[in-house]
Amino acid sequence: MAHSMDISYRQGIRSKGFAITCPTGTTQQTLSLSGLAKSFEGLIISSAFTATPQTLINPKQLRVTLTINNDVSIDDDSAMSYAIPAVGGFAGGFPFFIPIPRRLTGQDTISIRFVNAAASQNVDVTVWYRNEL
């Protein structure tokens, strides 16, 4: 029984969060996952406030590009397409993410770039991945 629980644990989905400050202009961030990561499952972007506390942001003003091992997976798209709304929560199940499945090797280069057309914003990016396929 312990062996089957070990396999189930290793195959389970995991998440890692990144807090990114996006001043006006372009911000690039490396998303470093565990060296055991074998499958990128997807991501979700969330942000409720600008760098000025209690000020709601408009995610439409953010553009996002996601690159996984030189493969541009999201190319200059509205961050709103990958975001949880600032109010009202979400109706999805758990885990809730935008699927962007990609194989990983454990020595991957994953980067996300935001282009911000307005005031500085704090953005949370949650990446979902698996250690085994």
Where are these regions (language model features)?
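Beta-strand-centric surfaces of beta-sandwich/beta-rich domains
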Residues: M1-L133
